Amino acid sequence: MGQKVHPIGMRVGIIRDWDAKWYAEKEYADYLHEDLAIRKFINKELAEASVSTIEIERAVNKVIVSLHTAKPGMVIGKGGANVDALRAQLNKLTGKQVHINIIEIKQPDLDAHLVGENIARQLEQRVAFRRAQKQAIQRTMRAGAKGIKTQVSGRLNGADIARSEGYSEGTVPLHTLRADIDYAWEEADTTYGKLGVKVWIYRGEVLPARKNTKGGK
């Protein structure tokens, strides 16, 4: 089960929280499409800013967007010019008041999305897929990860038949629900077609917070 299911989706409500924090009844579809439009726009505008997670919260006529990025200076811009322009564009896109929070990622080598993005960009620059994966694994393990697994799929080295090849180091316990496993999937556009890049990073165990019951037990 743990090998097949999405590692983050399986842990939501246990050790992970939702990336979208809002509730709706009749407007659910509209909000969902708006969320997708916001995420697509931000990923396009900030493609070079190493943005990993985008969290969206909603209040009455207000949207709070939290950007987790390894390059906060690039997102903010000189004197806050870039973030102000982004806020204005999102206000126009949604027709609501958008607030942007910027959260710095202290260790980008422990973020699966950024590691996968780095491998994908190297593959686009014709770096050998084995070398790109092994270098990423070394950097992640040096950053303090307990384990990492990577996989690249597609027409590797321009081969006629697509295949998958992966490497791993340390342990990646996908069945253990308290294991803090970050997962990401990225695409690399090469001259031979698209290559898929998958990354699993095990960052250690997280013990779920105990819930208070009646009588304080």
From Swiss-Prot:
Q: Which residues form the KH type-2 domain?
A: 38-106
Q: Does this entry carry the keyword Transcription?
A: no
Which SUPFAM superfamilies does the record cross-reference, listed alphabetically? Prokaryotic type KH domain (KH-domain type II) (SSF54814), Ribosomal protein S3 C-terminal domain (SSF54821)
The Gene Ontology terms for molecular function here are: mRNA binding; rRNA binding; structural constituent of ribosome
Q: Key word DNA damage present in the record? A: no
CC annotations in GO: cytosolic small ribosomal subunit
InterPro entries per UniProt:
KH_dom, KH_dom-like_a/b, KH_dom_type_2, KH_sf_prok-type, Ribosomal_S3_C_sf, Ribosomal_uS3_bac-typ, Ribosomal_uS3_C, Ribosomal_uS3_CS
Q: Name one GO biological process term.
A: translation
Instruction: Give the record's keywords alphabetically.
Output: Ribonucleoprotein, Ribosomal protein, RNA-binding, rRNA-binding
Q: Sum up the protein's function in the record's words.
A: Binds the lower part of the 30S subunit head. Binds mRNA in the 70S ribosome, positioning it for translation.
Q: What family is this? A: Belongs to the universal ribosomal protein uS3 family.
Query: Which PANTHER family is this protein grouped with?
Result: 30S/40S RIBOSOMAL PROTEIN S3, SMALL RIBOSOMAL SUBUNIT PROTEIN US3C
Oligomeric state and partners? Part of the 30S ribosomal subunit. Forms a tight complex with proteins S10 and S14.
Question: What name does this protein carry?
Answer: Small ribosomal subunit protein uS3
Source taxonomy: Bacteria, Bacillati, Bacillota, Bacilli, Lactobacillales
